[in-house]
Regions:
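Conserved tyrosine-mediated DNA breakage-rejoining catalytic core shared by Y-recombinases
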Residues: 48-76, 80-85
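Extended, non-globular alpha-helical segments
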Residues: 1-13
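Single conserved hydrophobic/aromatic residue that forms the stacking wall/gate
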Residues: 169-180
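Short helix-to-turn junction characteristic of helix-turn-helix DNA-binding domains
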Residues: 36, 150-151
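Active-site-proximal segment of tyrosine recombinases
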Residues: 45-47, 136-137, 147, 155-166, ...
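Basic, Lys/Arg- and aromatic-enriched nucleic-acid-binding interface segment
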Residues: 10-39, 43
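Short, charged phosphate-coordinating catalytic segments
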Residues: 36-59, 158-159
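C-terminal catalytic core of Y-nucleophile DNA break-rejoin enzymes
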Residues: 5, 71-90, 102-125
Length: 180
C-alpha cells in the first residue's frame, strides 16, 4: 500500500475537482470531492454527514459552519463551509428529488445507508487515473491536499493543528533526516 499524496499542482487540482462536472457528469461525486478538498475531514466523517449538518432545511440556506464529532478522535470539530463547497453542494442538492435533514449527503445504494468507503475510494481513484495524476491519490489525499495548500498560503501551524485536531506538532511533521 502506498502513502497517500496531496495533489500539489493547482491545475491538476482544478481538473480533479471538476472531473465529475466536466468529464463524467455526476453531481454527487462532484460534491464529494468539493467537500473533501475544502473541509479536511477524514473520509469516514465525510461519508457520515447528513444534510442537516450543512443545510438549514427550515430556513432554506446553507450553514456557515459544519460542526461534527470525529469518529477517530471523538473530538468535536467546526469547519467553515466556503463558497466553493456551498456551490458544489447546492448544484447536487438541486438535482435531487427529495432532501431531508436526516438523509445522508452521500447515500449508499441501499436505503438509509451512507456511501461506503470503498465506493468513495473508487470514485476518487477513477478520476485520478483518468487524469493521470501521480500515484498515491486516495480518499486521504483530499485531506492532505487541504493541508498542503493551507500551509503554502501561510496558515500558521497552530491553526492547522486545530483544524486537524492534533495535539502535538510532531505528529504532523514529516520525518527529517538527522544532520551529519
Amino acid at each position: 500500500m502506498s502513502t497517500a499524496q496531496p495533489i500539489r499542482n493547482i491545475d491538476e487540482l482544478e481538473a480533479f475537482r471538476r472531473f465529475y462536472l466536466d468529464n463524467e457528469p455526476n453531481l454527487r461525486n462532484y460534491a464529494l470531492i468539493c467537500l473533501g478538498v475544502n473541509s479536511a475531514l477524514r473520509i469516514s466523517d465525510l461519508l457520515e454527514l447528513r444534510w442537516k449538518d450543512v443545510y438549514d432545511i427550515k430556513e432554506k440556506h446553507f450553514r456557515k459552519h459544519l460542526v461534527t464529532t470525529e469518529k477517530k478522535t471523538g473530538k468535536e470539530t467546526r469547519i467553515a463551509i466556503n463558497k466553493s463547497t456551498r456551490k458544489g453542494l447546492s448544484r447536487y442538492m438541486e438535482s435531487l428529488d427529495d432532501v431531508t435533514g436526516e438523509g445522508y449527503i452521500f447515500p449508499g445504494r441501499y436505503n438509509n445507508t451512507a456511501l461506503s468507503r470503498s465506493q468513495a475510494f473508487r470514485i476518487i481513484k477513477h478520476a485520478a487515473d483518468i487524469l493521470n495524476l501521480e500515484n498515491g491519490i486516495s480518499c486521504h489525499s483530499m485531506r492532505k491536499t487541504f493541508g498542503y495548500y493551507a500551509w503554502k498560503c501561510g496558515t500558521p501551524p497552530a491553526i492547522l493543528m486545530d483544524i486537524y485536531n492534533l495535539s502535538l506538532i510532531h505528529i504532523s511533521e514529516p520525518t527529517r533526516p538527522e544532520p551529519i
